[in-house]
Amino acid sequence: FAELREDMEGAYYGFYFVEIASYYCREANDEREMLKLLYQTMRALINEKIPNRLIRYIYELKAICINGEAPQVFQCVVCGDKERPGKFSTLKGGKVCTHCIRDVYDGLELDPSTWYTLQYIESAKVEHLYNFTVSDQVLRELAMVMGRYMDVYVDHQFKSLEILKLMT
């Protein structure tokens, strides 16, 4: 990925993605899916049509999925309802429908496009992850969801992310 030598921000995103892969991967485990994700993500970084922030949120969510810690975005985590609208609760681990929301204090109201994006990222094959863009609103909502989710469920402070935050 020689193109990243001339793109400091892209290079630091790459460092961040490698750091996440290092955090999740374990010796003697079958880590092909995570390595495939890392490879496709690095390829996406050199594609100027996809914003780096979107690449970041896609990578974070898919890495969490591969590790088996994905939020439930297809149905209510409390009652299992798939039809009712809901809010995203980090503390509950995903979608909470309008019927079950009364005990939830961290619910985020998400645009239907954001719900669809989360569902697509979780269900798509790694090879098809980086073939779309989103509106600014969806990008902001993805930032909120992934920021909160990473803070609660990923027990690690990534040094490269700290540098990225200073750069952007």
Residue ranges of model-derived segments:
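Non-catalytic alpha-helical scaffolds and adjoining flexible linkers that form interface surfaces
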Residues: 1-168
